[in-house]
Amino acid sequence: MESLVYFLSLRAENENQSLLRRLKNLTRILLDERLNKGDLVAIKLHFGEPGNHAFIRPIFVRQVVEAVKEMGGKPFLTDANTLYKGMRSNAVDHLESAIYNGFSYSSVGAPIIIADGIYGDYFKEIEINLKNFKKIRVAGAIHDADFLLTLTHVKGHIGTGLGGAIKNVGMGCAPRSGKQMQHAQFKPDPNSSLCIGCSRC
């Protein structure tokens, strides 16, 4: 299946052709006839761990927020808590991390809502009846939003090789328990003939 890919040139002869202006215009084009006035728009992105630089910068996110507002939407930035221990495993630390990396109402023009609540236990269960899952868990604020818009950076991933848009939605929109369900497929497969019973694996 082929995807439509848009390219924004960095070349600009004046302010109206800047990358930021072009990003806002592209957002308007992509949302035209999809977004309804008054929609609560979840802008799903990754805020990064404190000091990490693998995230989309707030100045770019602000262009998307402004475009959504100009089209009558009510945007909020969101992500779900992580499964692993770190600075994004609960909503308080997650918000602190977002602020540390430059995300705040004053920098992006939209509130930040951690999608699965303080401890990662606010979710809705949805029946899908597919091969690997009969039911899935979706972070509550993602489920409750009228519209989902994702902003994704590409990164390396230990289990899949590459993480991007599918991971941002599939794993990133799941509460902690939903992430556990997805990671349940990754189980150790020790060679029993080499096992010495040390319990390290």
PLM regions with names:
Residues 1-200:
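N-terminal and secondary-structure boundary signal
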